[in-house]
Amino acid sequence: MQASIESTGNLERRLTFTLPQERLETHVGGRLRELARTTRIKGFRPGKVPTKVIEQRFGQQVRAEAMEGLLRETFDSAVREHSLRLAGNPRIDQGESDFDFVATFEVVPDFGDIDVTNLSVVRHTAEVTDADIDQMIENLRLQRRTWNPVERGAQVGDLVALETWSQAGNERLPAEGVETGSSVLGSGVMFDQIEKGLEGLSKGEDKALSIDFPADWRVPQLAGKTVQVHVKAVEVSEPVLPEVNKEFIKSFGVKSGDAEQFRADIRTNLERELKGALMNRLRREVGEQLIAAYAHVEMPPRLVENEARSMLAQQVDQMRRSGRNPGEIPADAHQGFMDAAAKRVLVGLLVGEVARRNELRLESKRVSETLRLIASTYEEPEQVIEMYRNDPQLMSGLQSRVMEEQVIDWIAERAKHTEQSLSFQDAIRV
């Protein structure tokens, strides 16, 4: 195989290679002969379709598929031959001839000796208590609450249906009429000063509030201004919580309606949530230590930029999902994510290096356990498991996640670590 490598930057390489033409022709010929034996075409007996007809009908597609496969195989072989470790996907361009190609890519930086025993890691622990289960049951009651109109003044926990309009200098919002809505006092959905101002209002009462909106407030006409907000309580309702009886318990999937089984199911769910939260804390803890220890190592610029663009895209998608308008995105908006992206890339590459150097292998048992854990959150867990097993992309993502967790655990076990006990609520808090 003809292949040459050159450095075009600290971490960028250019690989020039040539595909073996005879192998391509051999593969194409073999595939066309196979199609001639198996393809049914009107006017010809099975297995008797002339090669010329097969070539005319399938030749272009077969050649393209063969070229793609051989291109990937030849590139991978050249990478192994030159002992290269890629960071990200290569860009492959056509060379001077149909069989010449030029691949440009970045490589994993040299981290030197990776000694995780010098890292200091805090490993958090927590457990689910009966009080946590009681609190979850109370939360479930709140989810199923109904509302009963009252004539008294509104208080925290009440649902207030309201009308509002605002005066910001010479501008009235809305220009005509009022805006209507509702809010549970104390939920934090509305601006805090407005929620406080609603407390004590009875049905039909109104009030003018002087509100100082922050400079980054989502409504541009109000941002950074002192605004007169006029509010009127259209109706005040107090919550009515359901009893924890058999009907209530059955509504959450416990067919027997048994209270002890209900609590056991809640414990299982909370323990699953806690396990994920503790791993996220450990991942963040180990990541911060790795960043502090290896911040001096240069990261592949293109990989960092791609990660920054991905982070921006995720934020825009989250804004749209939550009903917020991300507005017009400047072409360089991803620049604001570059520092965070560089740290994320550093941790990702380091985790990969630790796994490679220490010959850590993916534990299939752990993959199966994680898959069962994910599936258990759905009504039809077996269908979810089957979906993952039949989708290579989903399964690959799961395996990458499990491998990362294995490496994080491996690092934490060998680092200098102390344990810190947390309550369940503190442990799951981001």
Curated annotation (Swiss-Prot):
GO cellular component assignments: cytoplasm
Keyword match Amino-acid biosynthesis: no
GO biological process, any: chaperone-mediated protein folding
Annotated EC: 5.2.1.8
Gene3D superfamilies with a match to the protein in the record: 3.10.50.40, Trigger factor ribosome-binding domain (3.30.70.1050), Trigger factor, C-terminal domain (1.10.3120.10)
Keyword Cell division appears in the UniProt entry: yes
The protein's enzyme class: isomerase
GO molecular function, one term: protein folding chaperone
Chief site of localization: cytoplasm
Biological role stated in the UniProt entry: Involved in protein export. Acts as a chaperone by maintaining the newly synthesized protein in an open conformation. Functions as a peptidyl-prolyl cis-trans isomerase.
Record protein name field: Trigger factor
Organism: Xanthomonas campestris pv. campestris (strain 8004)
Gene from which the chain derives: tig
